[in-house]
C-alpha cells in the first residue's frame, strides 16, 4: 500500500520515509506538488515502464518508442519484450549516417499510426534529446508523452541537459545510473485527468493503481530510504560539480579516442556516454597510419567488450543503426560516471583512451595493460 493506506500495521516510520523520498524527488527537479506526483515504489525501470503502459493503454494499443538498434531500450516496444507483445509497437530511429534522432520521421510515424504513448529517451544515445519536440508531436496526435530519462536523470537534475518536465505527461527514471542511488525506479506523473473519456482518475492516480496492486506487492522500504538519500544528495552543490566533471570526462575520452583513430557514433557526446563504431570503417587511416587491420581482423562489440574486460576496462557492447544482432553488435558503449566518482579527471581519460587503443588496435599484452591500470587506480581508491 501507500503512506496512510497500508495493509499492515506498524508502518508509521515507513510512511514518513516514503513521503520524504517523494518530497526530495520533486525538489530535485524543481517540481510543484500541485502539478506533479511521484511514485517511489517501482522495483526497477522495466516494471515501472510496464506499469505506465498498463495504466494508460489497453492490450493492442499502439506504443511508439526508439528502436533497440538506434539506442532505445527493450521496454520501448522491442518484440522480445512484453512491451512489444502486449502492445502494437511502432519504432522510430536515427539518421543512419549521423546517428542523430530523426524528428521528421518521428512526426510522420506519429501522424500515421496515432500511438497512445510516445516514448522519448534512450539507453544508448550520446546527444541531447529535444523533449519539447517530442511533446509537440505527442500533443498533435493526442498521445501521452512519456520521457524515460533513466540514463540522464542526474544531468537533468544538475541543469546540464534540457528538462523533459515542461513537455511531458509522465517521466520515469531509474535511480542507480547518473543519480548514483540504489537499483530502483521512480515515476513522475502529472495530476491532470486521463485522456480517456469520462474517466475521473488523474494520470498519477491511474499509475499508482498500476504499480500497486497492479504490478507489485509490498514496497522495498529499505530501498526507498536509499532513494530519499540519493535525491537529498542530488540537491547539493557538490552534485552539480560532479555531473559537470562527468560530462567533461566523457568529452575528453571522446576526443582522445578520435585521436587514436576510432570513429564515434554521432562524432562525439553531449552527456555521460559515448559509443565507438566498430564497423569496418571504424579506423581513420589519415589519423593512425600504423593501424592496418584487415576486415577479417575487425572486432565486434562482444569481442571488444571481452578483451577490454580481460585488461581491466569495463565497457558495454551496444547496437548501432542497422545491426541485426543485439548479442554481437557493432558498437561499444563507454560511460564516465563511475570513474568520475572515484576522482578520475580529463588527464586520466586520455590514458584510458590510450589503453583502449592498445588493447583493440595494437593488440598488446592484456596482462601488462592490466598492471598499468591497477597502478593508476591505486591513486583512486573506492573507499
Where are these regions (language model features)?
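Conserved PLP-binding catalytic core of the aspartate aminotransferase-like
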Residues: 263-288, 297-343
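A glycine-rich phosphate-binding loop feature that marks nucleotide/adenosyl-phosphate handling sites
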Residues: 228, 245-251, 267-275, 321-326, ...
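Conserved PLP-enzyme active-site core in the AAT-like
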Residues: 15-16, 20-261
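Short acidic (Asp/Glu) and glycine-rich catalytic loops that position anionic groups and cofactors
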Residues: 1-4, 115, 204-209, 224-234, ...
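PLP-dependent enzyme catalytic core of the Aspartate aminotransferase-like
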Residues: 248, 288, 326-383
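Glycine-/proline-rich flexible loop or hinge segments
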Residues: 1-11, 34-36
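Short, basic, low-complexity termini and linkers enriched in Ser/Thr/Gly/Pro
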Residues: 191-203, 280-295
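Residues at alpha-helix caps and immediate loop-helix transition turns in enzyme cores, especially N-
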Residues: 130-133, 300, 348
